[in-house]
């Protein structure tokens, strides 16, 4: 069981983390998980795929002509559903089983904590709760539909909290408040703001989501820039998707996870891709670095590397002098 949260006056209350989003329990060697170093969340394994302990089945499609470097006689460049029935087409059945990366004792403790968390969550799902916490970041809430030419849709903002209280329970994990552009314009939420409000609690693919916020009180307001709808729409149009999800980018105020809604026939599958609001496709070239007060753009500062050559960064341009 997780230890409770103790206030300075000695009063102790229950403490919870989001067990669904833990990535220290399972790993899966499927290629789709390679961008995440094969770490998979508890929610993905137990709820979305249900692949523990029996695993999941996938099929590797192959083309005898394309594998040899020859061209397809039907003009296709990739193997797909239209290749079914072709004499050069074959598929290989592959079974992937998630692996447990903790000891048996820790896994049993995890299962107990998971049951306690789910009991707590189900008791609050769909109900109005009181939440109090400090804003960690504010991100535009964006979705993309590949069937509509990859159109990005703006749905307001996500006010992100990392530590707070749900009623009298200490939630030491991420929690997301969905607000409209008008609400964000009114309260100007920004990192560091101390907020108390009532909202309806729910869960979306493992995330704890708060909606329909009311009786909002800004107990402490920080100075600094804040997102508004016009600025967010410009960032959405000029941003860029990343192929991976580096920890630095996930925690950066310029990075946000976009819900991708793939429509295959009558089914709609949802996954998330990392989107950089600054339009930086290569995290290695990103000038933003984490500091105690947030992220700072290092453009215009000098950097020196050990060795024969000196590298200087000025206004985002690298100069090398032997």
Language model regions located:
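Short, solvent-exposed interaction modules
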Residues: 175-182, 250
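Small-residue-enriched segments and motifs
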Residues: 133-136, 199, 252
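OB-fold (S1/OB) nucleic-acid-binding surfaces
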Residues: 143-177, 265-285
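Beta-strand elements of well-folded, non-transmembrane domains
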Residues: 137-139, 163-167, 181, 201-203
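Short nucleic-acid-contacting surface segments enriched for D/E, G, S/T with interspersed K/R
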Residues: 179-198
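Short, charged beta-turn/beta-strand-edge "cap" motif at the junction between a beta-strand
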Residues: 198-209, 215
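OB/S1-fold single-stranded nucleic-acid-binding modules
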Residues: 5-143, 212, 216-235, 244-245, ...
